[in-house]
């Protein structure tokens, strides 16, 4: 269960709140029907090699609140340029093995969350709610929950690269 009030109007910093509202989000947004449809689609998919997705509450909650949103930060970013992203787990539908491999390395279940920059990187969430970015250069830790990950992407905070021992 989340330790914050998802209807609170002061949940995000001003710049993040503005980017979220620009994308169509508002405090209390909750589309469980869409989240359940995504969950069903992921559960039903089996790769040619037999790999399947796992679905868990942290993912469904993130999809229910932020699913379908195209979120873009403005400004120069704190460390790097803000990263536009889309919350839609079906961007990772055909990456069941990749997501499962990350989960094995982390010792937890992981499933797709969305994508950065029109497919430049896959966003994934684990069973504890932690969020990651997977791209051609490696795997990155974006935050301890969806809120922190959104802040990281919208404000241009440099993410931590995952290594064999965890984030650097």
Model-inferred region functions:
Residues 138-167:
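Compact, glycine/acidic-enriched structural inserts
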Residues 131-136:
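Short, compact, well-ordered microdomains
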